[in-house]
Amino acid sequence: AMTSIAQSKSYRGFVEGGYGAFVGSKTGSVLSLSTSHGKMFGPIFVGGGIGIEQAWVKNESYLEGYISESGWDSWIGRKTFKGINVPVFANIKGIWNNKKLSPTFEVKAGFDLGMAWGLMGEAGAGCRFDLGKTALATTVFTKGVYEPDNLVTDDAKYVEGWFTSLGLKVAWEF
């Protein structure tokens, strides 16, 4: 009989929600919901995932331009931008033991689609809590780095540069 990966003892899935605040030269915040699926190789999970994020970038500079009688003129404006991103990523998690409380780490690397097209990476460390027969919760403090090729806002303004966030995520494991 064929066994699907979801029926395999080494299969793991995660659903996680989180909040992060941008730090450094960017200010704002991001709410996220994602899912990862893959296999356990001993204490290491290897898989991939997809998510959805709502981001707000406050008082961001942007370049505005227009053609005047004297030629091309431009100026720097400031505005709060918001938009949806869809991160697609590879995911590695380490779980040290299977006790009621276990230290854990995770690394994600991939690509953001949506408002900010570009590379994304995230690293985190936290604790995994055994809540009974099938429920396992993980709380992870994360640092995310995003490098959009061009962040295009709803009104076609462009924002460039690196975004760094610090956050907290809570996951349910199955």
Question: Model features per residue range: what roles?
Answer:
Residues 4-41, 45, 169, 173:
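Short glycine/proline- and aromatic-enriched beta-strand/turn motifs that initiate or cap beta-hairpins
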Residues 5-11, 27, 97-103, 130-137:
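Short loop/turn motifs that connect adjacent beta-strands in outer-membrane beta-barrel proteins
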Residues 9-11, 27-31, 82-88, 101-103, ...:
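Residues that define the transmembrane beta-barrel architecture of outer-membrane proteins
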Residues 13-21, 35, 48-52, 90, ...:
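Transmembrane beta-barrel strands of outer-membrane/channel proteins
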Residues 20-22, 74-79, 108-113, 152-158:
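Extracellular loop and loop/strand-boundary signature of outer-membrane beta-barrel proteins
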